[in-house]
Swiss-Prot record:
It is a peripheral membrane protein. Component of the ubiquinol-cytochrome c oxidoreductase (cytochrome b-c1 complex, complex III, CIII), a multisubunit enzyme composed of 10 subunits. The complex is composed of 3 respiratory subunits cytochrome b (COB), cytochrome c1 (CYT1) and Rieske protein (RIP1), 2 core protein subunits COR1 and QCR2, and 5 low-molecular weight protein subunits QCR6, QCR7, QCR8, QCR9 and QCR10. GO terms for cellular component: mitochondrial crista; mitochondrial inner membrane; mitochondrion; respiratory chain complex III. This is Cytochrome b-c1 complex subunit 2, mitochondrial.
């Protein structure tokens, strides 16, 4: 079986906090606090990115330097990441040091000082660097544009702070107050004893976080199809398609993504990447073609779209996808379960399209 018998998984609630843990006979543990505070929930463009960059700055009880040095002495590391759904605070450490890291993450969530000088000297420069790096990748640019034209708001919000909309320190504090609540976060541990984690969480500042409400969307997001955008870019050219996916069709598009990027498909050599981004209320399937030569990109995207419009039998990739999905779920605290029973065929209908790079020599949507 894919689920190792030695792994114990439990999920419960500590004063309305969702806590999950898996134990395993290894020395290294990880602790993650996943907050539903990603860019889709942003009250202003980029505020989630700036809040994410404020994590592990000075708190009311520890300086940022002290936090890093304490963790280094214990041999551990901290990291804070952002995506469209979550701000995730993560620590990796030796198993016996769990109490320290529970308290450290709780301290960040509950007592970040939000000093004005940190915004100008640390947070904004780091956020601008993130944005500059992302802007150098034409695939990343195409992906962001696909989200924007597909969903417009919510999932279509900019992932990173670009400085277009002014975000003040008070805006960041207010957003933190909105998302850093008991009902809006999940605590998970890998190679952690479940009973110990629940006890340490209960004894930490996490249990005193203010009450609020879960921001998790319960309804399917509004989306648009047949949209197009074109972005001039010096470098490689990219042609990308995006398809919004409802919850019932997630399994089909998961199989499609694996099929198109494997040796099972004759199109795999033409495709740079294809994936399904899954959310609790749906998803977005994206496919990218990238090359230095815009003529190659143009030819390949036309071949791919024409072939997908004819229809594809996905059955050869179902078992492969089941295996891959099961392995991935082993490392996810709250996986989105997929039912592959009804997956058979796929035929491309309406989709959204983005061209990045030498757009004068890339096709338009109505040419595909």
């Amino acid at each position: 079986m894919l689920s190792a018998a030695r792994l114990q998984f439990a999920q419960g609630s500590v004063r309305r906090l969702t806590v999950s843990a898996r134990d395993a006979p290894t020395k290294i543990s990880t602790l993650a606090v996943k907050v539903h505070g990603g860019s889709r929930y942003a009250t202003k463009d980029g505020v989630a990115h700036l809040l994410n960059r404020f994590n592990f700055q000075n708190t009311n009880t520890r300086s940022a330097l002290k936090l890093v040095r304490e963790s280094e002495l214990l041999g551990g590391t901290f990291k804070s990441t952002l995506d469209r759904e979550y701000i995730t605070l993560k620590a990796t450490f030796l198993k016996d040091d769990l109490p320290y890291y529970v308290n450290a993450l709780a301290d960040v969530l509950y007592k970040t000082a939000f000093k004005p000088h940190e915004l100008t000297e640390s947070v904004l420069p780091a956020a601008r660097y993130d944005y500059a790096v992302a802007e150098q990748c034409p695939v990343k640019s195409a992906e962001d544009q696909l989200y924007a034209i597909t969903f417009r708001k919510g999932l279509g919000n900019p992932l990173l702070y670009d400085g277009v909309e002014r975000v003040s320190l008070q805006d960041i504090k207010d957003f933190a107050d909105k998302v850093y609540t008991k009902e809006n976060l999940e605590v998970s541990g890998e190679n952690v004893v479940e009973a110990d984690l629940k006890r340490f969480v209960d004894e930490s500042l996490l249990s005193t976080l203010p009450a609020g409400k879960s921001l998790v969307s319960k309804s399917e997001p509004k989306f648009f199809l047949g949209e197009e955008n074109r972005v001039r870019f010096i470098g490689d050219s990219v042609a990308a398609i995006g398809i919004p996916v409802n919850k019932a069709s997630l399994a089909q598009y998961e199989v499609l993504a694996n099929y198109l990027t494997s040796a099972l498909s004759e199109l795999s050599g033409l495709i740079s990447s294809a994936k399904l981004d899954k959310f609790t209320d749906g998803g977005l399937f994206t496919l990218f073609v990238r090359d230095q030569d815009s003529a190659v990109v143009s030819s390949n995207i036309k071949k791919i779209v024409a072939d997908l419009k004819k229809g594809k039998d996905l059955s050869p990739a179902i078992n492969y996808t089941k295996l891959k999905n099961a392995v991935q779920n082993e490392s996810v605290s709250s996986p989105i379960e997929l039912n592959f029973d009804a997956v058979k065929d796929f035929k491309l209908g309406k989709f959204n399209y983005v061209a990045v790079g030498d757009v004068s020599n890339l096709p338009y949507l109505d040419e595909l």
